[in-house]
Amino acid sequence: MSFNANLDTLYRQVIMDHYKNPRNKGVLNDSIVVDMNNPTCGDRIRLTMKLDGDIVEDAKFEGEGCSISMASASMMTQAIKGKDIETALSMSKIFSDMMQGKEYDDSIDLGDIEALQGVSKFPARIKCATLSWKALEKGVAKEEGGN
């Protein structure tokens, strides 16, 4: 078995682990609430976040969807907790670039999120992977706009 095949297998295992055992599943009370959906495949997510100044104090999600969208939400909420908003948004940009097959800044450790790299080869699934990240961006914009 080649190195790439082993890596693909590992990445699939990481994705399935986050799908079957999602981190941060649930709802936060008194928080920023963002509902997003992907009409193409039916994925739905509700992201709830609490900020302490410019720090993402906590983030949880609930929803229904394919393994990629739910695993991505699990990975994202895990990755952004404790990060400042600027870093969280930078991670979102990096993830978006990765999904589009663009060169991306690898100076920020994405952790398990890198397991989703292979999704970029399947254009129909990119929206699944980026749904929770779009919710993050919308939530930050909502908070900064005071809505």
Swiss-Prot record:
Gene Ontology cellular-component terms listed: cytoplasm
Outcome after substituting residue 66 to A: Does not interact with SufS, does not activate SufS; no effect in presence of wild-type protein. Binds about 15% Zn(2+)
Stored InterPro entries: NIF_FeS_clus_asmbl_NifU_N
Keyword rRNA-binding: no
Phenotype when changing residue 41 to D: Complete loss of growth without mevalonate
Annotated residues for binding of Zn(2+): 41, 43, 66, 128
Cofactor dependence: Zn(2+)
Highest rank taxon of the organism: Bacteria
Textual note on the cofactor: Bind 1 Zn(2+) per monomer.
The UniProt record lists the keyword Cytoplasm: no
Effect of residue 41 to A: Does not activate SufS; dominant negative to wild-type protein, interacts with SufS. Binds about 40% Zn(2+)
GO biological process, one term: intracellular iron ion homeostasis
Keyword annotations from UniProtKB, A to Z: Metal-binding, Transferase, Zinc
GO molecular function, one term: transferase activity
Subunit structure: Interacts with SufS; this interaction enhances SufS cysteine desulfurase activity. Interacts with frataxin/Fra.
Family statement drawn from the similarity comment of this UniProt entry: Belongs to the NifU family.
Functional note: Part of the SUF-like system that mediates the biosynthesis of iron-sulfur (Fe-S) clusters. Acts as a sulfurtransferase and thus transfers sulfur from SufS to SufB. Mechanistically, the transfer from SufS to SufU is triggered by zinc-ligand swapping that provides a free thiol from SufU to accept sulfur from SufS.
The name this protein goes by in its record: Zinc-dependent sulfurtransferase SufU
